[in-house]
Amino acid sequence: MKINLLTFGVSTLVERNIGYITQIIGPVLDAAFPPGKMPNIYNSLIVKGQNPAGQQINVTCEVQQLLGNNKVRAIAMSATDGLTRGMEVIDTGAPLSVPVGQATLGRIFNVLGEPVDNLGPINADKKSSIHEPAPAFTQLDTKLSIFETGIKVVDLLAPYRRGGKIGLFGGAGVGKTVLIMELINNIAKAHGGVSVFGGVGERTREGNDLYTEMKESKVINEQNLSESKVALVYGQMNEPPGARMRVGLTALTIAEYFRDVNKQDVLLFIDNIFRFVQAGSEVSALLGRMPSAVGYQPTLSTEMGSLQERITSTKEGSITSIQAVYVPADDLTDPAPATTFAHLDATTVLSRGLAAKGIYPAVDPLDSTSTMLQPWIVGEEHYETAQGVKQTLQRYKELQDIIAILGLDELSEEDRLTVARARKIERFLSQPFFVAEVFTGSPGKYVSLAETIKGFQMILSGELDSLPEQAFYLVGNIEEATAKAGISQMED
C-alpha cells in the first residue's frame, strides 16, 4: 500500500512501513518492524494515536540503534506521556526535515521545524534534512579573511575569521544579548547577510526576552517579517534530551540553505554549546552506552565534530558561528569545554569589571584572543597597533595596585603617561550600539577597521594626550572624540 507522507514531513510517495512500540523507557522507545522493513539510522518515526484520556498523540522520534530481532531503538523529540506498548509507529523513510529559506526569517521554530510563535504556518517552498555531510574539501574556501563586525574592540584585538567559530564567554548581565543583537544588525547592514539563532537547552524566559528585545530593536520586523534579519530555533531546558541534542542541527540546516542557495554570509549563534554536549550525554546513557571521562558520552568528539565541521566557508558563502560556552564549575579542563576549544578560532570574553565601569561592549581586551591576529594575516600595521594597545593596558593593570595604595602622584612621569593613555584606550574601546539606541538615546556607530586602527595609533603616538579622557567614551571613530573634546572645551 502506498501513502503520501506529506503530512509527516516527507514529501515523497513511499511504501507504508508500520511497526509497533514494544518498550518505553522515558524519552527512549523500542519499536518492532516486519522482517526486511527495518528503518535506517536517523530515520524519523511518527507515533500517532490516542492516550487513555482520549487526547490525540503525535510524537516524532529518531532512530538511534538497530537492536536485532527486527527491533530499533529511537529517541523521542517531544514528551512520551500517554504512549503505550502496541501503538503504531510509522517509518517516514527519511531523516527529520525542516523548512528553509526566506520564509523562516522573523519566525521561531522548535526542533521539528514547527513554528511556535502563534503567527500561523510557514509558507516555505523547501524542506531540508537536518543530517547532511560537511562540505567536501573541494568546496571549501581556504583563504584566511577577517570578518569585519564594525565593533572596535572585536575587530582590533580579537578579530573574527570569515567562516570561523568564536567562543563567547560571560556571566549573566554583562551584555551578551546586546552584543549578539548588534552583530546580527551589523552583518545585515554591512554584509547583506542574515543570522540564525539556535537556543540550545537554555531558559525559556531568556528565549522570550531575546525575542521581545529583537522586536524592539527592529532586528525582527513585525510589520514585514520577510525584512527581518534573523530566524530563531529554540529547544529549551524543559524539552526532552533528544530535542536539545538535535536543535543545533535544525538551526545549522537553516543557516546552510542561506549559505549554499542564497550565497550569503550567515551568522549562526548557538546558546549554549555546552547544553548540546549535555543532551548528548543524557541520550548516550539512555541508549545504554558505557560512559567515558567525567560521565560524558564516549562519542563526545564525534558528535561535536559532526556539528562543527558543517560550520565553514565555501566558495559560495560562509557560516560564521558565535557559540556561548558555559564552563561547568569554571573548570576549563572539563571534557565538554575542552572539546569545544579545539574547534574555536577566537574567544570573546565579557568582563563584569568593565560592565561595572559602564564600558560597553564589556569585552575584556586582554583575555579575548584570536588565531587571526598574526602579522601575515591582518598586516603589520594592524598587528603592531593591537600589540601596542595590549601592552599599554597590561602595564596599566600592573600599576593599579600601586595607584590604589599610593595614588597617581607616586608614579614616574613615564608611567603616568601610560596610565593616561590606557584610560583613553579603555574608553575608546566602548562604542554606542544601534540596537541600544532605543534605550540610550544615542545613535549607534559602525566603525570600519581602517578607522579603528587609525584612532588607536593616534592615542598610542601621543597626538591626543591633551584631550580629556571623557571625550573618548562611547564614540565611534577618533574624529568624533576630537569633536566631542572641542565641544566640551567650548562649554568650559
Curated annotation (Swiss-Prot):
Enzyme class, UniProt record, top EC level: translocase
Keyword S-adenosyl-L-methionine: no
Catalytic activity: ATP + H2O + 4 H(+)(in) = ADP + phosphate + 5 H(+)(out)
Short name of any one Pfam family annotated for the protein: ATP-synt_ab_N
Protein's UniProt keywords contain Membrane: yes
Membrane-topology descriptor: Peripheral membrane protein
Family: Belongs to the ATPase alpha/beta chains family.
Function: Produces ATP from ADP in the presence of a proton gradient across the membrane. The catalytic sites are hosted primarily by the beta subunits.
Subunit: F-type ATPases have 2 components, CF(1) - the catalytic core - and CF(0) - the membrane proton channel. CF(1) has five subunits: alpha(3), beta(3), gamma(1), delta(1), epsilon(1). CF(0) has four main subunits: a(1), b(1), b'(1) and c(9-12).
Protein's name according to its UniProt entry: ATP synthase subunit beta, chloroplastic
Species assigned in the record: Psilotum nudum (Whisk fern)
Lineage: Eukaryota, Viridiplantae, Streptophyta, Embryophyta, Tracheophyta
Gene expressing this chain: atpB
